[in-house]
């Protein structure tokens, strides 16, 4: 197999280039990269690709027993479809849970005072638990009867 990889390089020869990095290109800080990762995670879990391709409405509507239109944020009984607000709300919860885990990890640093450590642990646990239980509530709104024991 290695001989097959060698065949193109018998004909091709790498040029002798001396490339330098442009002076205006700087290494981004860790927080800049982290912010880009969190924003991209928010957009991807929110279904931005689905929203661009399918172009769903931001919220839906359902007719009640009196004939009035009532807005709904969740497209019930459809796992493979969503409204834009539904995707953004779910994405916010997923991102909040992920940030909760990161806050819990940051509370482990050795130089944090005891009160700050307690506050970080509390905020981290609240973020993780709130996002978990709200995701379960969203699933019950999306699929009534699901996860009902």
From Swiss-Prot:
Membrane topology: Multi-pass membrane protein
Main location: endoplasmic reticulum
Biological process according to GO: protein glycosylation
Recorded metabolic or biological pathway in which this protein acts: Protein modification; protein glycosylation
Subcellular location: Endoplasmic reticulum; Membrane
Domain of life assignment: Eukaryota
Alphabetized InterPro entries for the sequence: OligosaccharylTrfase_OST3/OST6, OSTC
Extracellular side: 54-83, 139-149
Spans through the membrane: 33-53, 84-104, 118-138
Residue spans, topological domain Cytoplasmic: 1-32, 105-117
Function: Subunit of STT3A-containing oligosaccharyl transferase (OST-A) complex that catalyzes the initial transfer of a defined glycan (Glc(3)Man(9)GlcNAc(2) in eukaryotes) from the lipid carrier dolichol-pyrophosphate to an asparagine residue within an Asn-X-Ser/Thr consensus motif in nascent polypeptide chains, the first step in protein N-glycosylation. N-glycosylation occurs cotranslationally and the complex associates with the Sec61 complex at the channel-forming translocon complex that mediates protein translocation across the endoplasmic reticulum (ER).
The protein's name in its UniProt record: Oligosaccharyltransferase complex subunit OSTC
Organism: Bos taurus
Lineage: Eukaryota, Metazoa, Chordata, Craniata, Vertebrata
Gene field: OSTC
């Amino acid at each position: 197999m290695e001989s097959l990889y060698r065949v193109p390089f018998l004909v091709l020869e790498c040029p002798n280039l001396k490339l330098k990095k442009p002076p205006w290109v700087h290494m981004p800080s860790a927080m800049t990269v982290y912010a880009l990762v969190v924003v991209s995670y928010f957009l991807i879990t929110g279904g931005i690709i689905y929203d661009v391709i399918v172009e769903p409405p931001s919220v839906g509507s359902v007719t009640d027993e009196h004939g009035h239109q009532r807005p709904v944020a969740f497209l019930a009984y459809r796992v493979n479809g969503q409204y834009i607000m539904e995707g953004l709300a779910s994405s916010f919860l997923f991102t909040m849970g992920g940030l909760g885990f990161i806050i819990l990890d940051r509370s482990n640093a050795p130089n944090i005072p005891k009160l700050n450590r307690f506050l970080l642990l509390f905020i981290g646990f609240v973020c993780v638990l709130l996002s978990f239980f709200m995701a379960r509530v969203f699933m019950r709104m999306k699929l009534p009867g699901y996860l009902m024991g």
